[in-house]
Amino acid sequence: SALATKGVKAVALVDMSDGVAEVAEALNARAGRAFAVPFKGNVTDETFRASVFDSISRQHGPVSLCVPAAGITRDELAVRVDKVTGKARIYSQDLFKLVVDVNLIAPVYWALEMIGRIAEDRAAKGLKRWTPGETVQGSVVFIGSISSQGNRGQISYASTKAGLEGAAATIMQEAIFHGVRCGVIHPGFTDTPMVRAMGMDYVAKNILPFTQLGRLIRPEEIADAICFMLTNSAVSGELWVDAGWHAPA
């Protein structure tokens, strides 16, 4: 909702759950206007992705901000040895591919969809390389994770979040030709249903002692960091929003 006060016309909320409509309704009530537009669908579906951009563009003009935040976890040890048989069981390749599709490929292609449309609009106007005398044409913020530095039991999740760092670094170099910025925020353990599902006893024992703040990060603190990266044109690269996390040895 902070974006509503910064001149943003509208925000497309994309999720597979029915709850996306309720979230949009709550944001609109807070903003006092029809600000959030819900879209229910699979972020890995190319046709759905294009339809979201088409719909928002028709209603509110070209998309210039992109925060592809969908993510899943399928956590298991990379290799586990059966105590009875002595046989090693390695992490499921199908699960790995699923996490990569949702957490890495989908975010990159949502960003590229926006950049491609901005590039087409500029080409149609006879514009080529963006110059500092112009306004910034767009901003991308990927949602990384402290797990990008490695985390036990998260071979697939950590790989995708590290992959976003490489994707962002490449997009930063390429997309500025079209006037588009790109960055990554790396949230720490945040007070969300996914983290609470670990059990608060586990959180108290295995997470909080390794944060400087000694508490879970509030979702609005992550939102503030995203808004900061979106709206401050001098900011690029990576921003760690981790409550002073230091991983245990």
Predicted regions mapped to residue ranges:
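Canonical Rossmann dinucleotide-binding motif of NAD(H)/NADP(H)-dependent dehydrogenases/reductases
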Residues: 1-12
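C-terminal substrate-recognition "lid" of short-chain dehydrogenase/reductases
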Residues: 215-242, 246
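Active-site-adjacent segment of SDR/Rossmann-fold oxidoreductases
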Residues: 6, 170-180, 233
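Catalytic loop of short-chain dehydrogenase/reductase
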Residues: 86-93, 119-163, 168-177, 189
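Substrate-binding pocket helix/loop in short-chain dehydrogenase/reductase
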Residues: 77-97, 207
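Conserved NAD(P)H cofactor-binding loop of Rossmann-fold oxidoreductase domains
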Residues: 69-83, 244
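A glycine/serine/threonine-rich, flexible loop-to-helix segment
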Residues: 80-82, 177, 189-211, 249
